[in-house]
């Protein structure tokens, strides 16, 4: 459907799996670990946020292969893991990191962008 979706962590992974992507185990467990991310593709979620920002990670599974209908919006700089995705047509977004965490200083801005600019 066309209902806006924002998948966070496991939700991000579930979106990829539902659309035919492939998941795998991360090379190392990233529970309570902070990484920098770089934006790869413009996304409404990152409007007003500077590139190369810290994010908090809590996961041991990653998206290894993206579904064709999606584009990668962000990757971690330390291990090049997929940290953000968006559907090319539908209002579906995923974030591997936790935007609600204190370890993601700009995370609430991403959530606010989703609510104000996608959900409306």
Which functions belong to the PLM regions below?
Residues 1-43, 54, 111-113:
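Cysteine-nucleophile active-site neighborhood
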Residues 9, 59, 98:
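Histidine-centered divalent metal-coordination motifs
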Residues 34-36, 82-84, 94:
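Conserved hydrophobic/aromatic beta-strand scaffold that supports enzyme active sites
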Residues 102-120:
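Acyltransferase
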């Amino acid at each position: 459907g066309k209902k806006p979706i924002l998948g966070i962590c496991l939700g991000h992974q579930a979106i990829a799996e539902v659309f035919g992507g492939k998941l795998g185990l991360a090379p190392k467990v990233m529970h309570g670990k902070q990484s920098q991310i770089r934006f790869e593709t413009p996304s409404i979620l990152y409007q007003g946020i500077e590139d190369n920002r810290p994010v908090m990670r809590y996961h041991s599974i990653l998206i290894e292969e993206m579904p064709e209908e999606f584009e990668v919006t962000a990757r971690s700089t330390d291990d090049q893991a997929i940290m953000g995705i968006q559907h090319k047509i539908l209002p579906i977004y995923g974030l591997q990191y936790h935007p609600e965490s204190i370890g993601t200083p700009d995370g609430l801005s991403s959530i606010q962008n989703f609510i104000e600019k996608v959900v409306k």
